[in-house]
Amino acid sequence: MTHSLPKLDYANEALAPIMSAETLDLHHGKHHQTYITNLNNFIKDTNMANMSLEEIISESSKDKSKAGIFNNASQHWNHNLFWKCMKPNGGGQMPSKLEKLSLIHI
């Protein structure tokens, strides 16, 4: 299984002004892609080549000699979650109770 960069559910400029199109493109298209490229290179011709991302993370976490695999697989998973959590126009209004608590601690 070759791991690949996920398609975003929004355009590169959709997160501006919080994240510019240039920043998003660099982070998604270059930074995240590097983790995927490294991961695919690490697992090529190994027993992990046909595993899901979660299986690779689980298996590589058990062996210190597979730290490179673990790091790149974990960063790929983290970035997948990051992109899913982002959305145009933010997440809307923070619930008032949470907003009050956050203001107390800032």
Model-predicted regions and their roles:
Residues 1-11:
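Acidic, low-complexity proline/glycine-rich segments
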Residues 104-106:
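Conserved small/polar residues in nucleotide/adenosyl-binding loops
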Residues 13-15:
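Secretory/endomembrane lumenal or extracellular ectodomains immediately following the signal peptide
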Residues 36-50, 61-98:
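Conserved alpha-helical segments that form or flank metal/cofactor-binding pockets of metalloenzymes
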Residues 21-43:
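Active-site nucleophile-adjacent alpha helix/oxyanion-hole segment immediately C-terminal to the catalytic cysteine
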Residues 55-58:
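Secondary-structure boundary elements
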Residues 5, 17-22:
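Short domain-edge segments at the starts or junctions of modular domains/repeats
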Residues 5, 32, 76:
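Divalent metal-coordination and catalytic microenvironments
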